[in-house]
Amino acid sequence: ISPYVYVENDEVTSIPDHVIEPQKKNLALLMHGGLAGADFKPEECFPNIIRHSLNYINEQKDSKKPFFLYLPITAPHTPILPSKEFQGKTSIGPYGDFVVMIDDMVRQIVKTLKKNKQLDNTIIVFASDNGCAGYIGVKDMEKKGHFPSYIYRGYKSDIYEGGHRIPLIVSWKGKYGKETNNSLVSLIDFYATFAQMLNHNLETEEAVDSYSMWPILSKKGASARKDLVHEAGEGYLSLRTSQLKLVFYGGSGGFSYPVKPADVAKFPPMQLFDIVKDPSEKENIIGDKRYENEVKEMKRAMKQYVENGRSTPGEKVSNDTKNSWNQVKIFMQEEEGI
């Protein structure tokens, strides 16, 4: 979203001086329009970020100090503009080609670390910030046999699993083989993870929702996380445990049906899913008496998290909203039954 500029050392590299027109292909949004800096060309954005990242890694070649590179790439987000050499690499269009470009970026980073003899001493974490966006030509991709949300319901912005389940891949030479860990974790857990890894003592108001994954990564134990709060694009919340997911709203809270108030009103005000038995969230079991106690406990937990200003153990942290915004009323107000 405009203005499209590069920011380097806390300053924009050029002042916006022209307008870029929006781009679409087969009804898929490739790029929003808007103001752009003089040195900004959309198709060069991702390659520029890759180049700067590789340069930074090379600059650390002879350093004796640990280095950290946070690389929030623009792909496969809009603007969906794969470089010329990647166009046509897949059969599902620009989005698929852009994903292949990400694969090549990973290849370049690993190759550079290996060349600099740093690979064996580097932890690489690959993740996404959310599920696939439903407005980038998903229906066309599905017709071609590619389902970006896999078996999961919904897309980016939705409260459903398709909006929140992401790849989280950790590579650490000599520590892991080809293995999978099904622990309940979140990207916010990296704050506490890095703190524990570096022996940093967290202050009261630091990482109030973050549980360390270091016991998992170091193979010395498990995360203390028992549940996880999700938030939809419209601010509606859900609470997820290892088996159940309670949604404190009757709709998606994002772009997928049901969205319009008239449609949401057709459904119960809350949704409950057994994520283990029903990972696709097809059956809302909120009225099932067998889960009545679990629902009550999950509502109490959410209320406590809001009142405490945190979902981790520790001193209370004040919210500036008086705990009364619309999306939390359903569990902040005492109600009988479900």
Give, region by region, the residue ranges found by the protein language model.
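C-terminal cap/loop subdomain of S1 sulfatases and analogous C-terminal strand-loop tails that border
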Residues: G134-V138, K144-I159, K175-S183, I188-Q271, ...
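Core domains of carbohydrate- and sulfate-ester-processing enzymes
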Residues: I1-H32, A133-I166, L246-V259, W325-I338
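Short glycine/proline- and acidic residue-enriched helix-loop micro-motifs
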Residues: A28-P42
